[in-house]
Amino acid sequence: GGGGGNVSGSYREAGGNMQPGAYGSYNYTGMDLSISRTAAPTYGGDNSFPGQESSRFRANQNCPLSTPDPLPCAKSQKSELSPADPATSSAHFTETEETSASSETDESTPRSGAPPRALQDNCSPGAAGTDGQSPQIFPWMRKLHINHDMAGPDGKRARTAYTRYQTLELEKEFHFNRYLTRRRRIEIAHTLCLSERQIKIWFQNRRMKWKKDNKLKSMSLATGSSAFQP
């Protein structure tokens, strides 16, 4: 009985000792003061922490400016400019060689053809001088001169071979006018590419034929009328 009382008394004393100590350590005013005191330095530490973070953030912002690596867009441009396939680059190189070779051949051909042009230019002033001295010659006049110079086997001038179109036009004109004026003769000569002399001779021959035909008709009519007379 006495031992149990001592144990309970010691337990109470221990409990009594623990309660004031716990109460003193966990005093409300002490807790508030301790929290406020401990919070002040921790809050100051918290105030200093954003400064460190801001300095780190600024350092991180300054890092891309100091990096020597080029921008990704420049890398992409370089990759686009660089040929992806060596076969395509070789094909492009061969095409440039072919085009350069063709341009060289094109340039060489005019150079080779240049001397004949120069010779023609040298010959042209002489021809121009001769043309300037001689009167102007039209194509139809040149053809007429050739026809006049041509001679037959007997030494006579060759007959002019009129085309069907020329003969038809001359027949039309003769049907309306048996005698031509000089102005009309020149117009017909230019139209049919003939000379005035050829037009004049053709009309003379056509009139002679017409007179001969009329004479034969008149003679036939006279003989016919005399035959019907009693």
From Swiss-Prot:
Q: Where in this chain does the entry annotate a coiled-coil region?
A: none
Biased composition range(s): Polar residues: 49-65
Entry's Gene Ontology BP terms: anterior/posterior pattern specification; embryonic skeletal system morphogenesis; positive regulation of transcription by RNA polymerase II
The UniProt entry's GO CC annotations, sorted and at most eight, read: nucleoplasm
Q: What UniProt keywords are attached to this protein's entry?
A: Developmental protein, DNA-binding, Homeobox, Nucleus, Transcription, Transcription regulation
* Stretches the record annotates as Disordered: 1-135
Output one GO MF annotation.
Answer: DNA-binding transcription factor activity, RNA polymerase II-specific
Identify the Pfam families for this entry.
Homeodomain
Q: What residue intervals hold the motif Antp-type hexapeptide?
A: 137-142
**Protein function:** Sequence-specific transcription factor which is part of a developmental regulatory system that provides cells with specific positional identities on the anterior-posterior axis.
Q: What is this protein called?
A: Homeobox protein Hox-B5
What is the species of this protein? Answer: Xenopus laevis
* Protein encoded by which gene: hoxb5
